[in-house]
Design a protein with these regions (language model features):
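Alpha-helical transmembrane segments in inner-membrane proteins
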Residues: 1-343
């Protein structure tokens, strides 16, 4: 069941792994169940039948219908899109860096995005839209700078990319701390709230751009998925097999950075999902390939589960989703280290 099978349709041939396909179906089912639970969770609790009727516009309670369609559904869809983007981006970063702990932090995107947001908040007292745009621009510039600094001659190796990313991230982290202590209390609190990441007050204006961004980037990632697997054999072996190593690596880095930018613009920086999603997906599928699709589904499931847990634990005030994912991520890392007997 773990082997590779071929599905032939005339002149077309599609390779697939039965276990990976089954895992994706299971993850999709779990995600739908969590989404349904979230649509019924809140100050106005709703049953599955009421949620379904409200989604179809046939609810008997107009207030419940408005809450489901205008408040809860955009939040749930944003969580799905953000989780999927981070999960697939994490799978790409882990493959490129040859590091199971790889994430967007590897090339400093998250720290760079935080720097852009903090500068806008502390120095310019900007609102949410300007803050998100500044975070996007700063994150992309940071990622580009790391890639350029990591180039040695015509190539940017995976380990060199990691080391340069760690150095740039550490420098920006110090700058962020300096900016936070120089701002007034209100600005610092707002900056910290943005840095925590949140799904609160998400609307359709957050859903549509994220959906369009993923619609453009996911096909590119899946198209280069096979080449990404070949890159894991090493640059020399991949080049001998006809893969344009540096071009494919740069293209995949840009795709992964774009996905992370989409997620950051929609919900702010969210920890843990890009790290754990691909790892858990690989354990579930037991596949040697890069878990792009299963990693995306696992990321969506993890973020939905974290949001549901946060709402169940705090009915009075919704906890920032970044806080919940950070807590889960800490326990996951401890479990991972204990399991591998590294401590």
């Amino acid at each position: 069941m773990n082997g590779l099978h071929a599905l032939r349709l005339g002149s077309l041939s599609l390779r697939w792994r039965p276990r990976a396909a089954l895992a994706c179906l299971v993850l999709a089912g779990v995600g739908l169940a969590l989404a349904a639970a979230l649509l019924g969770t809140g100050s106005l609790a709703l049953g599955p039948a009421e949620v379904f009727a409200s989604l179809l516009g046939q609810g008997q309670d107009p207030t419940a219908q408005r809450i489901v369609q205008r408040v809860r559904l955009p939040r749930v869809l944003t969580a799905c899109l953000v989780g999927a983007a981070l999960g697939m981006a994490g799978a790409i970063f882990q493959s490129i860096s040859s590091n199971p702990l790889g994430s967007p932090d590897v090339i400093g995107f998250t720290t760079g995005a935080a720097s852009g947001a903090i500068v806008q908040i502390i120095l310019f007292d900007a609102g949410p839209l300007a803050t998100s745009l500044a975070a996007l621009a700063a994150g992309l510039c940071t990622a580009l700078a790391v890639v350029l600094l990591a180039r040695r001659g015509a190539t940017a190796g995976g380990y060199r990319l990691v080391l340069v990313g760690i150095g740039v991230g550490a420098s920006l982290s110090g700058l962020n701390s300096l900016l936070l202590v120089t701002g007034n209390l209100d600005q610092a609190m707002y900056a910290q709230l943005w840095l925590a990441g949140s799904l609160n007050t998400r609307t359709w204006s957050h859903v549509v751009p994220a959906a369009l961004g993923l619609l453009a980037s996911v096909p590119l990632a899946l198209y280069h998925g096979r080449r990404l697997e070949v890159l894991e054999l090493g640059d020399a072996s991949a080049a001998q097999l006809g893969v344009a190593v540096e071009r494919v690596r740069l293209q995949m880095v840009l795709v992964a950075v774009g996905m992370t930018a989409i997620a950051t613009a929609a919900a702010g920086p969210i920890a843990f999902i890009a790290l754990a999603g691909p790892q858990l997906a690989r354990r579930l599928t037991r596949s040697a390939g890069v878990p792009l699709l299963s990693g995306a589904l696992m990321g969506a499931v993890l973020l939905l589960a974290a949001d549901l847990l946060g709402q169940r634990l705090a009915y009075v005030a919704n906890l920032p989703i970044g806080l919940m994912t950070g807590l889960l991520g800490g326990f996951y890392l401890l479990w991972l280290l204990l399991r591998s007997r590294r401590i």
